[in-house]
Amino acid sequence: MRLSDFDFALPEGLVAQAPVTPRDASRLMVLAPGEGAPAHRGFADLPELLAPGDLLVFNDTRVIPARLLGHKASGGKVELLLCEPLEGGLGRRWRAMGQASKPIREGAVLTFDGLEARVDGVEGEGFYRVTLDRQGPELEAALGRAGRIPLPPYIRRAPDAEDAARYQTIWARAPGSAAAPTAGLHFTEPLLARLAARGIRRTAVTLHVGPGTFLPIRGDDLDLHRMHGERYEVSPAAAEELAATRARGGRIVAVGTTSVRTLESAWRDGAVAAGPGRTELFIRPGHPFHAVDAMVTNFHLPRSTLLVLVCAFGGQGRVLAAYREAVARGYRFFSYGDAMLVLRR
């Protein structure tokens, strides 16, 4: 399977540079089961498009100010992006991406406005293992002072005060992500209330978003691509809610590709298993979906693992045709853009 089969032309002007207000004022393309044409709705219409007894599954990770600009002991400039908490949450040990004018060596001490990071290991391809000099609330305060919101590079502006709130879901709880689970950015408290009033339930899993989600695929052969690992957790309460929904005949509606990957990664012996894990699952056409019946997702980059996942879920030809229609109709793309609801049943 070739990466070039997952390409499409996207005018630069359709890349959303800022969010809409309110969050649920974005547009929503709907791909229903079968081969019918896409429907075009507003995101606020979501309660009408789901059924009582369906279960929305959110990713409750919280984006941290993970981009750090500082210097080495020599005075040279250095940049780190904290990518993966190796101890869970805001611990001391992290996997990070780094760059500097000269190689970053094992044992180097990097300083970021008072926050220090010791380089414990060099993994190659710009990845490092680092130990920070604080954890928990002290680390959170230090990141608030020294770090920046890690907006994606296709948002061609510096992050501002609005991004601190808007590049975060309203239910974000567990700190640890270097990017937002963007399908969740469309939800508002009034929309959640309307969903609940219709009998649509919700639960949450946690996947800390890192390079496995946002790094590009190198090379054209998808079979050679290896995902970077990302840590996830499914609580016992979430696992019970998922099983109960299936038993009642309700649909599991994953909000975002990270929720899809969490649920599919945690599938064991006919059910989603509770507990922590680390996933390197690369979902591509041919994947046998077990845990997910529908998904809410944004419009993704050409030639990305995220687009490949959506094509696996909704059908490659149908999804790519829908993307071409989205371009023709002026949908907004990527993190701050519009959304798609893909239903398998």
From Swiss-Prot:
It catalyses: 7-aminomethyl-7-carbaguanosine(34) in tRNA + S-adenosyl-L-methionine = epoxyqueuosine(34) in tRNA + adenine + L-methionine + 2 H(+). GO terms for biological process: queuosine biosynthetic process; tRNA wobble guanine modification. Pathway: tRNA modification; tRNA-queuosine biosynthesis. Its EC number is 2.4.99.17. Keywords: Cytoplasm, Queuosine biosynthesis, S-adenosyl-L-methionine, Transferase. InterPro entries: QueA (IPR003699), QueA_dom1 (IPR042118), QueA_dom2 (IPR042119), QueA_sf (IPR036100). It comes from the Bacteria. Transmembrane segments: none annotated. GO terms for molecular function: S-adenosylmethionine:tRNA ribosyltransferase-isomerase activity. GO terms for cellular component: cytoplasm. The keyword Membrane does not apply. The keyword NADP does not apply. It holds the Pfam family Queuosine_synth. PANTHER family: S-ADENOSYLMETHIONINE:TRNA RIBOSYLTRANSFERASE-ISOMERASE (PTHR30307:SF0). Belongs to the QueA family. Transfers and isomerizes the ribose moiety from AdoMet to the 7-aminomethyl group of 7-deazaguanine (preQ1-tRNA) to give epoxyqueuosine (oQ-tRNA). Monomer. This is S-adenosylmethionine:tRNA ribosyltransferase-isomerase. It comes from Anaeromyxobacter sp. (strain K). The lineage of its organism: Bacteria, Pseudomonadati, Myxococcota, Myxococcia, Myxococcales.
